[in-house]
Amino acid sequence: MRFPKPLFFLLACGMSLPTCASTQAPPSRVTVLYDAFGGGAGLTRDWGFAVLVEYGGKRILFDTGNNAEVFAHNVRALGIDLKNLDFVVISHRHGDHTAGLNYLLTVNPSVKIYAPKEGFGVFGAALPGTFYRSDSALPRRMRYFDGRPPVELTFGTPWPAAHFVWIDSVTEVAPGVSIIPTVSQTPGTLELRELSLALRTPDGLILIVGCSHPGIETIVEASARVANHVSLILGGLHLVTTPDAEIERIATSLHDRWHVDRIAPGHCTGEPAFAALERVFKARYLYAGLGTTIDLP
């Protein structure tokens, strides 16, 4: 029997047009919500960083910017629904990545937030009650907790109601989505814990980085625990005060030694580093200013 074309289409779709439409793959992309360059469409520039990552059907907020009001303004201007997030990743404790939590938690108070695990961290933390050296010869009044400490000591946070999950090892948090912790050895940020987001794609890993305080090469090296090849690096590389010679070395190393395919620098990468990376990566340099959307494989 031959059916009219519209009827045949409905039968092929199980008599339901919405069902057919729902078979389309969800978008895979990164949208820059917060940065100090770019903009347009009523967006407000400010020093800080935040992106929305859409990948594998997940909606992931990575960092929240420097000012809750600016973050809220940009989110609304871009039509982003923060109630519809699968989880949040906070790269590190600095205020230009965390301040927007104050707005986020008014909109989505129960969202899961992955954050670095630190002994006395701003995201809250816990240590064994015996983490300190004790002296049993002291009188009780001079001993912590009268010499009988709790099994675990928990430490406060400016966001006590938030659902923080602390990360201190490479962790797959969704299919194809991993969080990679690294530790800074740089003077000024010594021992700072930082999380980067790694997405598996057919072309290799996509690394979303906040500030790269531990060093972008250190982060790329650590990503080998997830996959051997990095297709794209997006975010802050913390070269904003780095001398030209070191910028040139790092840009060349990312391209020639680590064989990174594409780079989309933002935030604290710095203007001289933008120029150097564009020279080295040429057509594989991607602009990633405020309001930009970059499609992922």
Task: List PLM regions with ranges.
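Bacterial N-terminal signal peptides that target proteins for export
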Residues: 1-8
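Bacterial N-terminal signal peptides
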Residues: 8-18
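Boundary at the C-terminal end of the N-terminal hydrophobic targeting segment
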Residues: 19-23
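Active-site metal-binding motif and surrounding structural segment of the metallo-beta-lactamase
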Residues: 69-118, 224-234, 238
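Metallo-beta-lactamase
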Residues: 119-195, 286-297
